[in-house]
Amino acid sequence: MLTLKNLSLTASDAQGRTDIVKNVSLDVEDGKFLVITGPNGGGKTTLAKLIMGLATPTGGQILLDGEDITPLSITDRARRGISYSFQQPPRFKGMKVSDLLTIAAGKTLSHDEACSYLTQVGLCARDYLGRDVDTSLSGGEVKRIEIATLLAKNSRLMIFDEPEAGIDLWSFARLTETVRDLHEKGRHTIIIISHQERIIRLADEIVLLANGEIAGRGTADELYPKLLSQTVAGCNLLEVNGIC
């Protein structure tokens, strides 16, 4: 189980101190699917980065199965099964998809093993294993390949930062199917930062984060009416990419 205890991040500059994440406490049980949503600038991505170790908290603790992992590096957290999917996954010119999967797995993969990871994310293995992870791939393809690397790592906790960003509707539909399938298998804990209703509706629980604090928490049926009733700068919280 992942536990956040009074997790905080305060930034300082010439204008003073800014609380980006404020005393966030949260339990995420193994196998659960949690969506963190809320207005832009509310601290969602920062919270995800704190869990992965991409940012360092100024207060509080992060526990994994009771172990305090707050001081651990990104590498050590990855070894404990935590993985992070960026809004815009990196591309690697000259690196084949098969090579990327092998690196993620930390061992030599058989052809069948590599194929299975791509098949699980809805990609035809024979069309992708030999391709470069470069600009010839669409945003949706790169994101599904990144999810395949998370599977190859045998990640117990997968964190996705706005996976819908920058992809077309067809790719988003396939991505949603992939996430649903992962959750139904029950082998992974999933945390997704998202505004998308279709993703929110799949979650076991939703956390509404605003101004760095938890402003609401519950199931989709419990929290969705609140999400619909709130607006930020005239835009519904669930508008795609915050566009009115």
Task: Label every PLM stretch briefly.
Residues 52:
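Helix-to-loop junction immediately C-terminal to a conserved catalytic motif
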Residues 60-67, 113:
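Conserved ABC transporter NBD signature motif
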Residues 88, 94-110:
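Q-loop/switch helix immediately C-terminal to the Walker
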Residues 162-163:
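Walker B catalytic motif
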Residues 213-236:
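Conserved beta-strand-loop-alpha-helix hinge in the C-terminal portion
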